[in-house]
């Protein structure tokens, strides 16, 4: 074989290899966003999520709200995580249930590290955190917790100004820009100082929490006080409680019924009620014991799948 012929074959081989490599790259049509290609070109504000209420508080005790860890919740398919914060007796900013004496699930930075580690290995997923500020601390405490987790702030979405409902990016845009972590705080947010820590009630209203009626017969605006639903996303607290001498405990025994996709007292039934009032489906439905019932089916139904 002559040298020119050999060079010709090598050139053809390189061209073929390059063609194969290019064809193997994911195209815009190949992208799957939060598990569904249908979600990619929907705005964040147009999607409905089921969320894990009190996501860090895991176990079999009366005060626990979930049965599986935060990582397992994400693996299960949950993309909206809520949790409470307080400072414990040692002054550590922690994920604590009502008080750190009742339940201390570790530092806020440890919780954030768990989320960041999961995001690292799931590049096509958008996750939302709703973190409550139980002690009314300066928002810098939250920023300090994020700063303690190397690289997590690279994922955070920080709009340049407050977004109207129709101005939110699509999941595709969030994924392709790498801004796949949306963070809301329920009080003391200051987006002039920390633009990625979004004020929950500038974007959402909520229905009442600590419900004890297993049929969830209402969907009224509870917070913020005096708020109006127009132009806001909204969050439904679909968590059933038992009142034990004035202490509200999650009702683990009825979780299968509460978290059913359809039927009386189900996710679907309350979503239908809310939709009849606000003429749009909830953006978030918060749930205890997310492995009970059929919560992901309910989420798909809310999103028209």
Curated annotation (Swiss-Prot):
Ordered alphabetically, the record's keywords are:
Glycoprotein, Hydrolase, Lipid degradation, Lipid metabolism, Secreted, Signal, Transducer
Query: Which SUPFAM superfamilies does this one have?
Result: PLC-like phosphodiesterases
Gene3D superfamilies membership: Phosphatidylinositol (PI) phosphodiesterase
> Which subcellular locations apply to this protein?
Secreted
Presence of the UniProt keyword Nucleotide-binding in the record: no
Q: Where is the signal peptide?
A: 1-24
Active-site residues, Swiss-Prot/TrEMBL: 53, 97
InterPro entries assigned: PI-PLC_domain, PLC-like_Pdiesterase_TIM-brl
Q: Which residues are glycosylated?
A: 237
Q: Which GO terms describe its biological process?
A: lipid catabolic process; signal transduction
Q: Cite the GO molecular-function annotations of the record.
A: phosphoric diester hydrolase activity
Superkingdom of the organism of origin: Eukaryota
Query: Could you tell me which residue ranges the PI-PLC X-box domain spans?
Result: 25-189
Can you supply one Gene Ontology CC term for this chain's record? extracellular region
State what protein this is by name: PI-PLC X domain-containing protein 1
């Amino acid at each position: 074989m002559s040298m020119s012929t050999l060079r010709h074959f090598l050139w053809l081989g390189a061209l073929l290899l390059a063609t194969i490599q290019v064809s193997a790259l994911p195209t815009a049509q190949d992208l799957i966003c939060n598990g569904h290609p249908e979600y990619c070109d929907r705005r964040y504000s147009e999607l409905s999520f089921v969320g894990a209420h009190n996501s860090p508080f895991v176990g079999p005790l009366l005060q626990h709200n979930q049965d599986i860890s935060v990582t397992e919740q994400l693996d299960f398919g949950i993309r909206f995580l809520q949790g409470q914060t307080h400072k414990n007796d040692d002054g550590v900013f922690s994920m604590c249930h009502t008080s750190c004496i009742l339940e201390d699930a570790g530092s806020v930075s440890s919780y954030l590290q768990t989320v960041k580690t999961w995001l690292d290995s799931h590049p096509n997923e958008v996750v939302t955190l709703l973190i409550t500020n139980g002690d009314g601390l300066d928002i810098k405490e939250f920023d300090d917790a994020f700063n303690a987790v190397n690289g997590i702030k690279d994922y955070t979405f920080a709009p340049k100004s407050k977004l109207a409902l129709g101005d939110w990016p699509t999941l595709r845009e969030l994924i392709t820009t790498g801004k796949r972590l949306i963070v809301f705080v329920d009080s003391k947010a200051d987006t002039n100082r920390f633009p990625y820590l979004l004020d929950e009630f500038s974007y959402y209203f909520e229905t009442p929490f600590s419900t004890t009626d297993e049929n969830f017969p209402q969907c009224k605006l509870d917070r913020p006080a005096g708020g109006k639903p127009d132009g806001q996303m909204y969050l439904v607290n679909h968590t059933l409680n038992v009142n034990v001498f004035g202490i509200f405990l999650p009702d683990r025994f009825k979780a299968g019924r509460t978290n059913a996709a359809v039927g009386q007292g189900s996710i679907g039934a309350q979503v239908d009620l809310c939709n009849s009032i606000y003429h749009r489906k909830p953006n978030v439905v918060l749930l205890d014991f997310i492995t009970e019932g059929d919560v992901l089916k309910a989420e798909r139904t809310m999103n028209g799948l």
